[in-house]
Swiss-Prot record:
N-glycosylated and possibly O-glycosylated. Belongs to the RL11 family. Glycans are attached at residues 22, 44, 49, 57, 65, 104, 108, 118, 135, 144. It comes from the Viruses. Keywords: Early protein, Glycoprotein, Membrane, Signal, Virion. It is found in: Virion membrane. Transmembrane segments: none annotated. It is a peripheral membrane protein. The keyword Iron-sulfur does not apply. This is Early glycoprotein GP48. GO terms for cellular component: membrane; virion membrane. Residues 1-21 form the signal peptide.
Amino acid sequence: MMLRAWRLMVLLAAYCYYVFANCSISTTTAPVEWKSPNRQIPKNITCANYSGTVGGNVTFQGLKNKTEDFLSWLLGSGYKSICSFFPQLPGDSNEQHYRYEVTNLTYNCTYDRLTLLNLTTENSRNYYFRREDANSTFYYSCYNLTVS
């Protein structure tokens, strides 16, 4: 029964995308990387769904990055930066990054993951992982968190 429902969702999403070229149906549970031609979060991006409990933790895994990529974890579609990582310089093994103060958010981040700590219901929202490669091409992955 679940397999039939999943197949129906996939077919519906494909039809919706083919006819309207923009859909908001989520059919995946794993994050997918979306290439952005205009450096903006793609309008048809599909978010991976995550759930957490109040007081718990959740970890988002970033996708496909290299040491020469510029990486950022973002809070919501307003592009509020949580932390950013800069390309490593040749011969320098130190990680170059900035960590930003975000109200009502306790977290740890590395170049490939973001862990939210001591979750509250205020943490329910979309989070984005942005990667800019050496050719200045932007890629995004989306994580939709629901805390209950």
